[in-house]
Every structure is written in structure tokens, then in C-alpha cells.
């Protein structure tokens, strides 16, 4: 019982002490500020409840003169503080200091010697212009430093000496023009570096080599045009890198290979024009790839993304010119689950592209100008369990009979199994003006089944085949034409032709060099009738102009009383012979060739032709048949004599010269319909396939007694 009063006195004493401390703490809290316990995460993402003094947005001109002794987090954001007096006493346990959005012009105005326990310092959106030598030397425990959105143009080589525990450094949105690797010598533990939105002229080899523990690097928005091959050398722990919003025209393939443990790659918003073979290959740990918002991206070529065994997601969206993805573009990606291809210029996506992705779970191709034909018919054949994202936004824009319909609602049987090539309008512009001696690259891509072959025609009429180099020209296998050191002589109209067994498509571009193209003062067009039959006319033409447009239009008119039946076909630019078939016997035709020039003028020539009667054609056939039999008999006789001579003769060399007989055969008609008459080319090699161009025939006055 005697102990009871003692216990009461002890409890009363503790209560009084606590009350006094609370009163003292309340008294120490700066006027208008809020002092309370708040949740906080350390730079290592460790949760704690910290004693916080919140003086944000109070218009303070000076640092608070007095703070609670146990203050851990001090928030002074959005004030007008210009300096911190050296006589200021800082709480000994201060771990977080936020001075962002103030008027600090120099780090030397901050007495850091008394803040040795600081873990995080926020100085963004001040007026700092430089970081001098050892300016933060006293902050040996600092783990986060935010100096972004200032006016920094100079950082001394030893500015970060003493910050050997720093984990995150934000230098983005300043005025830095170069990166000095000496900055990083004092930062052996740095894991995150932000350097974006600085007018950095270039990155050098080994720029980041001292940062052996760096995991994330952001170099966004600094107008980089190239990345040196060894720029990322030494960063063996780098997992994430962002080149967002730069001016890269191609993937920095060699440099990326040096980041052997890279997991996340952001190349968004760069003017890369195509993803080439091997651009993303053998990156064994890459999980996500971003190639969005690329204004110049036209195609993803064969084996562009290859052997990425851990890749889970590809994002290639909002690319206004991306019109072609090769069937083998994505290869050896066993874990890819998500393929985002929406809001591009894709008219189709090959089934082979999807078949090569065994683990694909979702795909997004909505908001593309889908052509509902043979290439896309696999979508509705119920051969896939892949989830289509936003299927209600997936519409056909072509052909006209399906325009506006949802792709998933068009039955696959309504789409042909084979179809004409289609060169995407976005592949390359219709005209281009370049300076002399510059480099020109034109990307021509087409979709079709069977897959089309692509070649180019120069203004002088030369045919440039894939994988061939000719003078200043080189055509890649995918269809890209390169012209090195172009001069006014090479100016003019270039035409890409895509052709398969079904037909062809073509697209032209006018290239001006120094604002002009070669003049054509003596261009002419001549038509010659080479053969006339009862049901056909074989015609040839010759154009001397160097810069004729490739889409020649041929029209054949037949005068009838009540008929205007037109035939049409497509003829290649470099074919100058055509057999107009399905004509009526004993009928007068007017055959015209109209060739527009690059100056929006046209050269047109017409000839009148009357087809032979059936009786006359029969006599011709009999006469020709007799001559043919006689020729064959004579030929057989000659062959017999030669064989006899060969048997009698005992001499001969097995190494003698071989002779070859060339047989020029007429090609069979393309039997799509009567609107596509057979094409005859007497000089074409059987291994070369030609594009075709539209030809029209209009019948007008067939005699009434003709059937």
C-alpha cells in the first residue's frame, strides 16, 4: 500500500513530461506550418512514419528560424527562399529536405555541413546555374538528389565528391551541353540517372563507364542523332534505358548490344524510318520494347526482332506511316504475350507473323486502314485463341463492298485466297526536293498473297532489281531504294512496282535536285501495229522521253451502235508490247496510248485498225500451218543429219563451248476475266515477273450479223 502513492507520482511525472514536450513541440512549430506524423518512404522504398514539418506554399522569404528538434521531413516547396544562412541550426535527425520551386541561385547558399543525416534533397525548379567542386561534400548519406528544371550549364568534374552513397541523380531539364564522365567517378553506387531535356550536343564513348551499378538511364529529349557504339560500355547492370523524343534515324543496334542485361527499352518518338534485320536480336533479357509515335517509321523488316527469349511485350502504336510488317519480322520470341499494333497505317497483318508467336495472348490492330482481302482473312478462320483488343474499332476500309464493316463480321469465304499487291500510300511521298550530292532512301513495301516481288524503275527507264547495285543505286531485298550522292542528272520520276502472279501495283515519286528535274525537249511517242487477226491486235509503242510517268493508259475504241464495253488491264512501265484480245472480226477499232508526263501534260497517239474477217484469218492459218509443217520437216531433217554426223565423228572435246537455243514463247493469258487480256513480251526472261498496267477497250459498232 505504501508503494501506491509512489506509482501515482511516477505516472503523474511521466504525464507532465509528455505534456511539456508536446507543448514545446507545438511552440517550436513555425507559424502557419503544419507539424505532424506522416507516412514516408525512404529512397530504398522502406516505409516509415516520420515527424514532418509542412511549410509548403506559404510565400516564405527565409528559412524557418526554429524547428521541432525531432523533425525528420521538412517541406518548403513553392516559397520565395533565396538563401539559407550558415548560422541556421538544422534538426539532427533531418532526413528529407524539399526546397523545390524557390529562388535559390547557388548551392553554396545552403549550409550542408550540418545535415549529415539527409537521405533526400529536392532542389528542382530553382535558379541554380552551376554545381561547383565539392558543393555537397557534407552529405555523405545522401541517396536522392533532384536538381532538375534549373538553369544548370556547368557542373565541375568534382561536383559530386563525397556523395558515394547516392542512388538517384536527376539532372534533366537544364542547360547542359555535354556529359563529363568525371562527374560519375564519385558515384560508384548510383542506380538511376536522369539526363533528359538538355541541349547535349553528343554522347561520347565510355561516357557512363564509372557507373557500374547503374540500373536505369533516361536520355530523353536531347536531340541525339546517333549513339556511339561504346556509349553504354561498362553498364553491365543496366536494366532500363529511354531514348524517348530524340532524333535517331536508325536503331543504335551496336550500342544496345553492350547493355547485356537490358530489360526495358524505350525508343518512342524517334524519326527511325524502318526497323531493320537484326536491329533487336540476341538481347537475352529484354522484356518490353517500345517503338511508338515514330513519325517516319514505314516498315518492320524480316527478322528485325529476333531471338529475344524473355520478351513479353511489343508496343508499336501511333506510327502514322507504319504500313508494313514482314511475315518473319518477329522470330524466336517464345514468351511474347502482348503485341500492340493499333493506330498505324497497316492495311494487313500476315498470318505468318502471328503463327511465329506461340505464346501470344493478346493483339491490338484496331484503328488501322484494314484491307479486307486475302492477307487478313485468317482473322475470321477460327484458327486462333488470341484476344483482339477493342474489336469494335476494327473496320474495313477496302474493298468498297466491305467498307465500314467490322473486320470480324466479314466471313473469310467472302475474301479471296490470293489478291493483288497493294503498295501503301504512306510508304513514300509523291514528290521530294533534295540538295545535290545528298543521300536519298525510299522505302517501298507492299502486301499481297502470294507475297509480291518489288523492283524500281529509274527516270531513264532502267530496271533496278532487289539486292543489286547499279551506279549510284542499290535496292534492298525488302524494297528500299538507296541513291548515294544524287545529282541533277538523277532527278526525275522513280517508280516502285510490286508484282505477283495475280497482278501488280505501282507508286511513283518525283525527285527534284536543287528544285529542278531534267528537261525533256524532244520526247515523242510512236505506235506500231505488229499483227492483226480476227480477234486480236498486237501493238507496240516507243516513247523517247526520259521522264515519262510509268502508269501508261491504253484505250481501244470500237464504233458500235449501242455498245460501250470497255476492257482493261495493267501493263508494266518497261513493257512496250501488248496483245489486245477478245476483239470482234471485221470491226474497226481506234487504239490510243495516252502517256502523261511529269509536268502534268500528256502525249497521246491513236491508230485506226480493222480486224480481219474469220474467213481471211482461216486462210492465213492454213497458209501458216503449211509453212509451219514444212519448217518442222526441214528442221527434223537437219537434226537427223546432225545426229548422224555426231555418231560418225569420233572427235570432240568435253570442254568445248556450249551453245544455247533461246525460245521466246508467248505467255498465257491471265485468266482473271475478260477485262485482263494476255500480256505479250517478246524479250522478257522467264525468271522475271512483270507488273501490269490498266488497258481499256470499248466496243462500239459490231455488225448485227456477227455473233
From Swiss-Prot:
PANTHER family: IG(IMMUNOGLOBULIN) AND LRR(LEUCINE RICH REPEAT) DOMAINS, LEUCINE-RICH REPEAT NEURONAL 3A. It is a single-pass type I membrane protein. Residues 523-614 form the Fibronectin type-III domain. It is found in: Membrane. The chain crosses the membrane at residues 627-647. Expressed in the brain, in Stronger expression in the ventricular zone and anlage of thalamus, spinal cord, and dorsal root ganglion in 11-17 dpc cerebellum and cerebral cortex in adults. Disulfide bonds join 444-496. The gene is Lrrn3. Residues 421-514 form the Ig-like C2-type domain. It comes from Mus musculus. InterPro entries: Cys-rich_flank_reg_C (IPR000483), FN3_dom (IPR003961), FN3_sf (IPR036116), Ig-like_dom (IPR007110), Ig-like_dom_sf (IPR036179), Ig-like_fold (IPR013783), Ig_I-set (IPR013098), Ig_sub (IPR003599). LRR repeats lie at residues 70-91, 93-114, 117-138, 141-162, 165-186, 189-210, 213-234, 237-258, 261-282, 285-304, 310-332, 335-358. This is Leucine-rich repeat neuronal protein 3. GO terms for biological process: positive regulation of synapse assembly. Residues 1-22 form the signal peptide.
Amino acid at each position: 500500500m505504501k508503494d501506491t502513492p509512489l506509482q501515482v507520482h511516477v505516472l503523474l511525472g511521466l504525464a507532465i513530461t509528455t505534456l511539456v514536450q508536446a507543448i514545446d513541440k507545438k511552440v517550436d512549430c513555425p507559424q502557419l506550418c503544419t507539424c505532424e506524423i506522416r507516412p514516408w518512404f525512404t529512397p530504398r522504398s522502406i516505409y516509415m512514419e516520420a515527424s514532418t514539418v509542412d511549410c509548403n506554399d506559404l510565400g516564405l522569404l527565409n528559412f524557418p528560424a526554429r524547428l521541432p528538434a525531432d523533425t525528420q521531413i521538412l517541406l518548403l516547396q513553392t516559397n520565395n527562399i533565396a538563401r539559407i544562412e550558415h548560422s541556421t541550426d538544422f534538426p539532427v535527425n533531418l532526413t528529407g529536405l524539399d526546397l523545390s520551386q524557390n529562388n535559390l541561385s547557388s548551392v553554396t547558399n545552403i549550409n550542408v555541413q550540418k545535415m549529415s543525416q539527409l537521405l533526400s534533397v529536392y532542389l528542382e525548379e530553382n535558379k541554380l546555374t552551376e554545381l561547383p567542386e565539392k558543393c555537397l561534400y557534407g552529405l555523405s548519406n545522401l541517396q536522392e538528389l533532384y536538381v532538375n528544371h534549373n538553369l544548370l550549364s556547368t557542373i565541375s568534374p568534382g561536383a559530386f565528391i563525397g556523395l558515394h552513397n547516392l542512388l538517384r541523380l536527376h539532372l534533366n531539364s537544364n542547360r547542359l551541353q555535354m556529359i563529363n564522365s568525371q562527374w560519375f567517378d564519385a558515384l560508384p553506387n548510383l542506380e538511376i540517372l536522369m539526363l533528359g531535356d538538355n541541349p547535349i550536343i553528343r554522347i561520347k564513348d565510355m561516357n557512363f563507364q564509372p557507373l557500374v551499378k547503374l540500373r536505369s538511364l533516361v536520355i530523353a529529349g536531347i536531340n541525339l542523332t546517333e549513339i556511339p557504339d561504346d556509349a553504354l560500355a561498362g553498364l553491365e547492370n543496366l536494366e532500363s534505358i529511354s531514348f524517348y523524343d530524340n532524333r535517331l534515324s536508325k536503331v543504335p543496334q551496336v550500342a544496345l548490344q553492350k547493355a547485356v542485361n537490358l530489360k526495358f527499352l524505350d525508343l518512342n518518338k524517334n524519326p527511325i524510318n524502318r526497323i531493320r534485320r537484326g536491329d533487336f536480336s540476341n538481347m537475352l533479357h529484354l522484356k518490353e520494347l517500345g517503338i511508338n509515335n515514330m513519325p517516319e517509321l514505314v516498315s518492320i523488316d524480316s527478322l528485325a526482332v529476333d531471338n529475344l527469349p524473355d520478351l513479353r511485350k511489343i508496343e508499336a502504336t501511333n506510327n502514322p506511316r507504319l504500313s508494313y510488317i514482314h511475315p518473319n519480322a518477329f522470330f524466336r520470341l517464345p514468351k511474347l504475350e502482348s503485341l500492340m499494333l493499333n493506330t498505324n497505317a497497316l492495311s494487313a497483318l500476315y498470318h505468318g507473323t502471328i503463327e511465329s508467336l506461340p505464346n501470344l495472348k493478346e493483339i491490338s490492330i484496331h484503328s488501322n486502314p484494314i484491307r479486307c482481302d486475302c492477307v487478313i482473312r485468317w482473322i475470321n478462320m477460327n484458327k486462333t485463341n488470341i484476344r483482339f483488343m477493342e474489336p469494335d474499332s476494327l473496320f474495313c476500309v477496302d474493298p468498297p463492298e466491305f467498307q465500314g464493316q467490322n473486320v470480324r463480321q466479314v466471313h473469310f469465304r467472302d475474301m479471296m485466297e490470293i489478291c493483288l499487291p497493294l503498295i501503301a500510300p504512306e510508304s513514300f511521298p509523291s514528290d521530294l526536293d533534295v540538295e545535290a550530292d545528298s543521300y536519298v532512301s525510299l522505302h517501298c513495301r507492299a502486301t499481297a498473297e502470294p507475297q509480291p516481288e518489288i523492283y524500281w524503275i529509274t527516270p531513264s527507264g532502267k530496271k533496278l532489281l532487289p539486292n543489286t547495285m547499279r551506279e549510284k543505286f542499290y535496292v534492298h531485298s525488302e524494297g528500299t531504294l538507296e541513291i548515294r550522292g544524287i545529282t541533277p542528272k538523277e532527278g526525275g520520276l522513280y517508280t516502285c512496282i510490286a508484282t505477283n502472279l495475280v497482278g501488280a501495283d505501282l507508286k511513283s515519286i518525283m525527285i527534284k535536285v536543287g528544285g529542278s528535274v531534267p528537261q525533256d525537249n524532244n520526247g515523242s511517242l510512236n505506235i506500231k501495229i505488229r499483227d492483226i487477226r480476227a480477234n486480236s491486235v498486237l501493238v507496240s509503242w516507243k516513247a523517247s522521253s526520259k521522264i515519262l510517268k510509268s502508269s501508261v493508259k491504253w484505250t481501244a475504241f470500237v464504233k458500235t451502235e449501242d455498245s460501250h464495253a470497255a476492257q482493261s488491264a495493267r501493263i508494266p512501265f518497261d513493257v512496250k508490247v501488248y496483245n489486245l484480245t477478245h476483239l470482234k472480226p471485221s470491226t474497226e477499232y481506234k487504239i490510243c496510248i495516252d502517256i502523261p508526263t511529269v509536268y502534268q501534260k500528256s502525249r497521246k497517239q491513236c491508230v485506226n485498225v480493222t480486224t480481219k474477217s474469220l474467213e481471211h484469218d482461216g486462210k492465213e492459218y492454213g497458209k501458216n500451218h503449211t509453212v509451219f509443217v514444212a519448217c518442222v520437216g526441214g528442221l527434223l531433217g537437219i537434226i537427223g543429219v546432225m545426229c548422224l554426223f555426231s555418231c560418225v565423228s569420233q572427235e570432240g572435246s568435253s570442254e568445248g563451248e556450249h551453245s544455247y537455243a533461246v525460245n521466246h514463247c508467248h505467255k498465257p493469258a491471265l485468266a482473271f476475266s475478260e477485262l485482263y487480256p494476255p500480256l505479250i513480251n517478246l524479250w522478257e526472261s522467264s525468271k522475271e515477273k512483270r507488273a501490269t498496267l490498266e488497258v481499256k477497250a470499248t466496243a462500239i459498232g459490231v455488225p448485227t450479223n456477227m455473233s
